[in-house]
Regions:
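Structural micro-motif
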Residues: 61-72
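Soluble periplasmic/extracytoplasmic beta-strand elements of cell-envelope proteins
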Residues: 22-25, 68-70, 81
Length: 107
């Protein structure tokens, strides 16, 4: 799990100072029809969108299914992962994601 976090940090070289929570959204170009449409509804979170196809093998070994949503706190600690199932759809209520974001930031 530490390797996964390190790979993500190195891949994106993102400064995470403006938000306490970062959401990494991973999907593939061949799965655009199943894009998760609710990201814009989420508050108090920095959203990074990543194309699975463009990432190295090590990244792909860590993300087993797309689409996927991965939440990190301000210390870059992995907090929660949601992944698409056999349907290649992400069936998670945005309220569930927002609840986890609020929990991380202490609201």
């Amino acid at each position: 799990m530490k390797t996964f976090l390190l790979v993500i940090l190195l891949l994106f070289s993102v400064s995470l100072y403006s938000q306490k929570v970062t959401l990494l959204y991973v999907n593939s170009s061949w799965n655009k029809s199943n894009d998760y449409k609710h990201l814009s509804k989420l508050k108090n979170v920095r959203v990074l969108k990543v194309n699975y196809d463009d990432k190295p093998k090590k990244f792909k070994q860590q993300v087993k299914s797309v689409p996927a949503i991965i939440l990190f706190d301000e210390s870059n600690k992995l907090k929660r992962v949601w992944q698409g199932g056999l349907s290649m759809r992400l069936n998670v209520d945005p309220k569930e994601i927002q609840t986890m974001i609020n929990k991380i930031i202490g609201q």
